[in-house]
């Protein structure tokens, strides 16, 4: 039974500890929009998105006012565009026109991002997939709200090294195409292994083909709440620490579950999942890094960091699963450098390197996220980092991703401003030894032996 103390506790989480619903994401299937005419395809895409999403933003605001729960973003994800545009698109420029249609639909609906300018190439690339991938630099430079993702591997299929090599080049080209904005286009481009179909978070959201025609997903966020809870158990043993994280994650997820159910009912769209991810922001007191330091680390990156993150990730899942009927997406702890003030501080003081971040991705929710690297970094080195991260995901049967930003004209130690939720980041050192001969072999890395479950 709910008592007044729990009500007050939730109010305090929202007012003082930065608890919010990070996103309500409306997933929309565009499979029924396929057409051999590019103009007709664009018209169908725009018409379907605007028909289904016309009340998304207003409904989100109503829920905010009625329940007092901040909902930071209202977003849209769509079917991976490479799957629906094969008949209509004969060149990268044709795909760019679809990106511009998505951008216009997002702007007209009042959402800040639309995801799904994507290709799924974990085993091989069709001609259409390759056209879309090659269009990404132009598409992201010509739009404001479009987010792109490419899935280059999975535990079941292995890693498509041809796609890995190509994505290193595409990230470099995207950085160059948006260099006037500190290579911001790369912040809207994610390379995945084991990408989920129901991720509500950008920039990696797309509406998977296993999903219904339309569905509501919700992503919660409460790093500040978890940190505040841990302040009351300083010096206690690990059992108490784990119990505290688990109970707090339960309460945070319950808020997301409530918002998801209400939004689903009012929009007349099925409820999909709640994503349990602890998503930080650049605001002070809204940091995953500060949670790890509250556990007893002098600075994130110190010995013990990976163990602390593993503990946090696991307890968040255990608490969250009890709080929602349907849990999905990425669900864990995000460690984006530019979006987390604690991570930024750790990089500046020298305790946190890319290599340590890679180790942390073995046990956390996603991967190497929002990391600024020198603009002179070769495409082959970026591909090598993608391959390393994909291997972690493939072998460990988990989602991993890379969102690197080679900032043109910047070098190690320079500070780069991205703005808003994307924050700012110091440019980090990348290992300069060459891996091009390895990357240029081409072909596929086979799936691991434990992927054979039949």
Swiss-Prot record:
Q: Give the transmembrane ranges.
A: none
Q: Which domain of life is it from?
A: Archaea
Pfam families per the record?
Answer: DUF711
Under Gene3D superfamilies, the record lists: 3.20.70.20
The text of the family note is:
Belongs to the UPF0210 family.
NCBIfam families linked to this entry? PRK05313.1
Supply the HAMAP family for this chain.
Answer: UPF0210
- Please state what the protein is called: UPF0210 protein Mhun_2657
Q: Which organism is it from?
A: Methanospirillum hungatei JF-1 (strain ATCC 27890 / DSM 864 / NBRC 100397 / JF-1)
């Amino acid at each position: 039974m709910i008592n007044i103390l729990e009500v007050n506790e939730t109010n305090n989480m929202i007012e003082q500890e930065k608890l919010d619903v990070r996103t309500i994401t409306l997933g929309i299937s565009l499979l029924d929009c396929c057409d051999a005419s590019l103009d007709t395809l664009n018209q169908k895409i725009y018409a379907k998105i605007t028909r289904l999403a016309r009340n998304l933003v207003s409904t989100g605001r109503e829920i905010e006012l009625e329940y007092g729960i901040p909902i930071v973003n209202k977003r849209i994800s769509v079917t991976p565009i490479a799957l629906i545009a094969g008949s209509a698109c004969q060149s990268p420029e044709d795909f760019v026109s679809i990106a511009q249609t998505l951008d216009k639909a997002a702007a007209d609906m009042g959402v800040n991002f639309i995801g799904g300018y994507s290709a799924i190439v974990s085993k091989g690339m069709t001609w259409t997939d390759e056209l879309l991938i090659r269009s990404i630099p132009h598409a992201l430079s010509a739009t404001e709200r479009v987010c792109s993702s490419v899935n280059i591997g999975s535990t079941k299929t292995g890693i498509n090294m041809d796609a890995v090599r190509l994505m290193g080049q595409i990230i470099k080209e995207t950085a160059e195409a948006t260099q006037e904005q500190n290579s911001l286009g790369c912040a809207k481009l994610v390379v995945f292994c084991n990408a989920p179909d129901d991720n509500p978070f950008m920039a990696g959201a797309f509406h998977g083909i296993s999903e219904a025609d339309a569905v509501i997903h919700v992503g919660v966020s409460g790093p500040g709440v978890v940190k505040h809870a841990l302040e009351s158990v300083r010096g206690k043993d690990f059992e108490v620490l784990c119990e505290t994280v688990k109970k707090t994650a339960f309460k945070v997820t319950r808020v997301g579950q409530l918002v998801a159910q209400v939004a689903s009912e009012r929009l007349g769209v099925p409820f999909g999942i709640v994503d349990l991810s602890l998503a930080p922001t650049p605001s002070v007191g809204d940091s995953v890094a500060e949670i790890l330091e509250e556990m007893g680390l002098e600075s994130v990156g110190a010995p013990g960091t990976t163990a602390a993150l593993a503990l946090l990730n696991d307890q968040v899942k255990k608490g969250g699963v009890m709080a929602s009927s349907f849990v999905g997406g990425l669900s864990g702890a995000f460690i984006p450098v530019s979006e987390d003030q604690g991570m930024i501080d750790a990089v500046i003081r020298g305790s946190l390197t890319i290599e340590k971040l890679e180790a942390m991705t073995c046990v956390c929710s996603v991967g190497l996220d929002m990391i600024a690297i020198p603009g002179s970094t070769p495409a082959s080195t970026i591909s090598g980092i993608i391959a390393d991260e994909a291997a972690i995901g493939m072998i460990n049967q988990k989602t991993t991703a890379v969102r690197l930003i080679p900032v043109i004209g910047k070098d190690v130690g320079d500070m780069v401003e991205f703005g808003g939720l994307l924050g700012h980041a110091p440019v980090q050192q990348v290992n300069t030894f060459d891996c091009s001969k390895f990357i240029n072999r081409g072909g596929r890395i086979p799936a691991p032996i434990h992927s054979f479950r039949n």
